[in-house]
Every structure is written in structure tokens, then in C-alpha cells.
Regions:
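Helix-biased detector of long, well-ordered alpha-helical tracts
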Residues: 1-174
Length: 174
């Protein structure tokens, strides 16, 4: 699907920079933490049939405990200083929407390994019970970036206590 000029411009305005072929894709912060908290609150009674109350309480706190919301500005600046070609603060539509938006806005193709995406076990288990795709859940607090030398940047983020991983790479196709 090709976007019209105005739609493409609006999409590009959401993203800082543009992905370049050969960029490594990095996710900082566990995806779907915000969405997990929301569905846990809204489906609490159903989830109590499967999980202990303590587990559900912890799931509600995921964004504040593991999310990057309070560190977003720090991560944003670190990415800029490390030469990131593009940065995007995830939100509605989750991780998969973020991937599509960045690729479409940048005119590149990409490959991603879902097994590498930082995600909490609580999210996986709750989504499995509710038959929800965790990669489409609200992911506020997580950041998707494109950068050359992604492994070094991920190590830098991890030293700061931030959950992060190289999850894929861009190419010239789209």
C-alpha cells in the first residue's frame, strides 16, 4: 500500500529522522508494558482465574517499573549522540505499527526477529490467556531506533539499566 503525499508527510512528521539501508533496528524498553497494564486493569476478574493477585499487581506496575517513560529523554539524547538515523516513540498500534511507520516513512525495507524484541514474561502470559497479539498492544514508553553499530549502543543502554536489544535491520527494499 502506497500512501498519498499528505499522508506520507504526516507520517514522516511523527518520526525523528529517517532510517537508512543497513541500519540496525533497536528497541529500548519492553514493548507492550503500557498495554499490559491496561488490559490487566480492565480484565482483572477474568485474569484472576489464571494468575495470583501478586502477579496481576506486578503486571499493572510494568510501565513504571520496566518502562522507559521517565528515561525517554535520556535515551533520545543518547541515541542522537550515538548517531541514530531515526527515532520513534512507540504508542498506539504497538511495536508492529512502529515498524511499519518507520519503514514506510523512510522508504526502506526491513527484517525483524520477534524473538529478539524486549518483552516481559507477564505480557506474554496475559496476552496468551486473552488471545491478544502483544506486538500490537499500546507500547508507550518504548522507543524504536535505527543506527549503525547497534550492538555497542544496546550495551550502553543496558549499562544504564535499560532493557534493549537489536531486533533487526533495514535494507533498500520496500
Amino acid at each position: 500500500m502506497k500512501l498519498g503525499k499528505k499522508a506520507l508527510e504526516a507520517l514522516q512528521a511523527e518520526i525523528d529522522g529517517r532510517l537508512m539501508p543497513g541500519d540496525e533496528l533497536i528497541v529500548a524498553g519492553p514493548v507492550a508494558a503500557e498495554g499490559t497494564a491496561w488490559i490487566t486493569k480492565n480484565y482483572h476478574d477474568r485474569l484472576r482465574e489464571f494468575f495470583a493477585e501478586r502477579f496481576l499487581e506486578d503486571a499493572v506496575k510494568l510501565p513504571e517499573v520496566y518502562g522507559t517513560g521517565t528515561e525517554n529523554d535520556k535515551i533520545w539524547k543518547m541515541a542522537e549522540e550515538s548517531g541514530a538515523s531515526a527515532r520513534y516513540r512507540m504508542g498506539e498500534g504497538g511495536f508492529l505499527a512502529a515498524l511499519w511507520k518507520m519503514a514506510e516513512a523512510s522508504g526502506v525495507g526491513l527484517s525483524a526477529d520477534l524473538r529478539s524484541v524486549p518483552i516481559r514474561q507477564e505480557t506474554i502470559e496475559i496476552c496468551e490467556i486473552l488471545d491478544v497479539n502483544p506486538y500490537k498492544l499500546l507500547s508507550g514508553g518504548s522507543i524504536l531506533m535505527g543506527i549503525h553499530g547497534g550492538d555497542a549502543f544496546v550495551q550502553q543502554l543496558r549499562r544504564e539499566g535499560i532493557m534493549a536489544a537489536v531486533i533487526g535491520q533495514t535494507d533498500s527494499g520496500n
